Regions:
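Amphipathic alpha-helical segments used for helix-helix packing
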Residues: 84-86, 98-125
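Residues in soluble alpha-helical coiled-coils and helical-bundle/repeat scaffolds
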Residues: 6, 52-56, 60, 78, ...
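Short, basic, alpha-helical segments at the C-terminal edge of helix-turn-helix-like DNA-binding modules
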Residues: 63-69
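Hydrophobic alpha-helical connector segments
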Residues: 60, 71-103, 155
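Hydrophobic/aromatic-rich alpha-helical bundle segments in the mid-to-C-terminal region
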Residues: 118-126, 130, 139-200, 206, ...
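Helix-turn-helix
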Residues: 14, 18-56, 60
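N-terminal intrinsically disordered/low-complexity leader segments
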Residues: 1-10, 194-224
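Solvent-exposed, amphipathic alpha-helical segments
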Residues: 18-26, 72, 76, 158-165
């Protein structure tokens, strides 16, 4: 039976979502097309009807993951535009670290992205540049444009690396994992002009799940 255009679009979206989730959970090289198809509720044939290769699917899956991530990070908070503080709180949170399948694709797969093909590298570069742009907008007119670019590059790289490092040690040393996130959140906040206004990651630490979520909100910073 011929697949309708609407159904083909639905199938493509399901494959992209399934691939994005699995790649972040288990790595690009750790997932095969059979598993992706199964998670999407489709067959091999349906996957290859949409994508010529796993690499092509990965490129689209990462692009879609970046888009959804930036939408969450920069979404309005209680009717007001998101600030730099809001973005840092979201990215460098315990919840973001612990929910790998829906997290930033770069922080989830950073160690293996350099081994992938050029097309995926281009999507990753676009995603990284967009994160840098968000940081630059958050910095606003606090310094000259060239300096803002340097600060934004350092902030974006520290955020990605901080989440990745925090995850890497979490099973063996939850306390160290939490310390990494707190330290990166504080330093990145200082680089972004938040010195004295940072409460640390939001959510409950891995090693202290029974403790209540910390009260108090950081003072707002530049709107994005």
């Amino acid at each position: 039976m011929k697949v309708t255009k609407a159904k083909a679009t639905e199938n493509r979206a399901a494959l992209v979502q399934a691939a994005g989730s699995l790649f972040r959970e288990r790595g690009i090289d750790g997932v095969g097309v059979a598993e992706i198809s199964k998670k999407a509720g489709l067959t091999h044939g349906a996957l290859y009807a949409q994508f010529p290769s796993k690499e092509a699917l990965a490129a689209e899956a990462f692009a879609a993951a970046f888009k959804r991530g930036f939408e969450r990070m920069t979404a309005d908070r209680n009717g007001r535009p998101a600030t730099l503080t809001d973005c840092l709180d979201w990215y460098l949170s315990f919840d973001h670290r612990d929910n790998v399948a829906t997290s930033c694709a770069m922080s989830a797969c950073v160690s293996e992205l350099a081994r992938q093909d050029k097309v995926l590298s281009e999507r990753v570069t676009e995603g990284f540049e967009r994160l840098v742009a968000v940081m630059e907008r958050g910095l606003g007119a606090s310094s000259v444009k060239a300096e803002n670019r340097q600060r934004a590059l350092a902030m974006a790289a520290a955020m990605i690396g901080g989440v990745a490092a925090s995850r890497a040690v979490a099973k063996a040393d939850p306390k160290l994992s939490n310390q990494i996130l707190r330290a990166v959140r504080r330093i990145v906040g200082e680089v972004g002009g938040e010195e004295g206004q940072v409460d640390g990651p939001r959510g409950r630490p891995r090693a202290t799940r029974k403790r209540a979520r910390g009260a108090g909100s950081p003072a707002p910073s530049s709107q994005l």
